């Protein structure tokens, strides 16, 4: 079993559990959203809180950090945009009638999913709703976006995807593909027998991978709606997915992570050692980092599956992880953000250069190096 990791810093400013953690594209800041109804901005250079974002009237469910703005959504049915330098609220997006689950900023548009059974798209600058996507029979949990330039330039595809395609996953057991320009449902992806908890897009291959409470992952052609393959070896809900080149990593309630060949559905590796469900995944430079309901984060050699390090210190489930340079960031329902030294991990060689474009799902992939931190 791998040795323990040392904590560089513990940031315990939140007064409730942290539901999400986002890293800015330039790697300079982190954003946390909490059960205490606030979000906080943190510097990756020194781990200090640099802004408190207050205004939501209920807990913050999710957040996304861009270079010049922070976005948060909440159980108060709203989304907010914030200035990252001053912490001032710049815009409130109103229209959802229940908890907003997820948001995604892409192509100067803001996408959102909600318990009110809808997804919506908003003008980032004006705060106005552009489209409402109705058709799911239960709450919409997860979403991803494929821009027009990522789709094939055939006459049929061009007409359907002039404004790009939005893919949503719901507790009704389906995923849906929506034409952003028209608001029409392009395809309904049926096959799961449980809620769709997570999804990720391979945009060059116009393929969606969905994970479900039915313990399967399914691959779909988002243009035709065809189910391409089913990944069946998990014995519990599939909670999180990570797509790296032609490999799909899946974290499950069965306490394992599995690595699959995206093109065939073959399981080529299983990562064990977790004592509870696997709640978060992040691949970085040959190392697979995981967060678990057992309150530990772990680092595995992505190629061999060997456990390299265990990071102990949290007292509740780890909801989200990010990696930047030589630092691992973990956010937990115990209310703490922890920074860990990951120097000395000798992971497998880096995989081949990534495909032309991978849809960003709930996180920002950054390759910048963080300024060194001294242990607390």
Curated annotation (Swiss-Prot):
SUPFAM superfamilies: Quinoprotein alcohol dehydrogenase-like, WD40 repeat-like. The keyword Repeat applies. This is WD repeat-containing protein 86. WD repeats lie at residues 13-52, 55-94, 95-132, 135-188, 191-232, 234-272, 274-310, 313-350. Pfam families: WD40. CDD domains: WD40. The keyword Secreted does not apply. SMART domains: WD40. It comes from the Eukaryota. InterPro entries: G-protein_beta_WD-40_rep, Quinoprotein_ADH-like_sf, WD40/YVTN_repeat-like_dom_sf, WD40_repeat_CS, WD40_repeat_dom_sf, WD40_rpt, WDR86-like. The gene is WDR86. Keywords: Repeat, WD repeat.
